[in-house]
Amino acid sequence: MRLRNVKGSRETIADNKYVVHNEESMKGKWSEFFGNTNPIHIEIGMGKGQFIMELARQNPDINYLGIEKYSSVLVHAIEKREQEEGMTNLYFIRMDAEYIENVFAENEVANIYLNFSDPWPKDRHAKRRLTSTHFFEHYDHILAPDGRVMFKTDNRPLFDFSLEQVPEAGWTLENYTYDLHHSEYNEGNIMTEYEAKFSALGTPINRLVAYRTKK
């Protein structure tokens, strides 16, 4: 799907106080950035930000970083963030997830959220999927020993692919469901904009939680 360009989005991001512009220099120093030692949770491909905004509201003792590579999408999250002046535990980064190890040190991230990621349907692009073994290797380097990767999607082929990739990457499935909203795991679920739209149409939402243990 081609994203609609938002005029002035790059300029808005460049001047915004809620966007971290020197993210690579913060590697290993995110606790200093937030001014506390609270756990750090990240959402990769956060879209318009509804999910991570609500997480930050509900959990003031957790620090959140929303990662989005498209300026035209990130500006919508910024608009929401600017309505929450009193919130001190949420910032954004505009970057490609491929370079995630340049931004976070070993064990620096407590949890990773992946919501409705690009399915990259062509086989030759499988490595680009955020639940490929390639990306799980990246997550392995930045995630704390007891950390989790939580993934939601309405795309069944992508979900089936992900279920195969987790053990192949040396990780373990803690739980998974093909219909989150009618499962025991739905309690406390926060919906993204996309999730709310398609769930209302009757589309089942798949979710998995994966973990690994540092050797």
Identify the meaning behind each predicted range:
Residues 70:
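Conserved SAM/SAH-binding beta-strand->alpha-helix loop
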Residues 146-153:
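Conserved beta-strand signature within the Rossmann-like core of class I S-adenosyl-L-methionine
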Residues 131-145:
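A short glycine-rich, Lys/Arg-flanked "PGG" loop and its adjoining helix->strand segment in the class I
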Residues 1-40, 50-57, 79-106:
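S-adenosyl-L-methionine
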Residues 102-111, 116:
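A short acidic, Gly/Pro-enriched loop at the edge of an enzyme's catalytic core
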